[in-house]
Amino acid sequence: ANCQNIYHVLAAMGLPVTSDIATALYVGLSTDTGNFMYDNVSSETLRIAAELKDLGADTDSLRLKLYESCSKKKITMMKYILNNLHISDDGQYAWSSISHQMMTDLQPESTDIDGLINTIKDIEGVEIAILFRGVEEKRTKASLRSKVWADVNQIAGMFGGGGHVRASGVSIDGDVEYAAALLGPAVEEIIRQHNAAECK
């Protein structure tokens, strides 16, 4: 996480870390690691988080604001993506979409969108989850997530996107239906290859 690097720079320069700075750095650590749940969490990450807590990071208010509070718009969008949910026959791939019209009508903030993909990813048995958002009439952003073995960075890279092994994104010229039809076969082929290798 970038906040780890910032913390090291501050320490190397001997600069004081106030409670406000500690709180800001803790926010970065927490959000970059999915509240310390992603596989990018190292023992160093946890040590720095503990040090930031000791330096006055307000973890209680952060917990409430980041993880235990939802706007009405976010709940509306969550309902929408669940109504549009698709799950593959083998249960390993799930996807949903938010149309450009819905995005235009609701005018969501970025915080209303953050974490929606996890609603799909957290379904039991799902390995790869994608949320398609119509950001323009013929422009779609796809957020890709995986749980255990799938490299979604590889999938996103096939279409000019990128990111991390467990979290990546890509922009597609076309509406959400087109984007879903484009990425779906690639996802299903990755799953097919993995399942075939597991059977050997």
PLM region descriptions:
Residues 1-48:
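Short alpha-helices
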Residues 31-200:
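Hydrophobic helix-and-loop "lid/oligomerization" segment in the mid-to-C-terminal part
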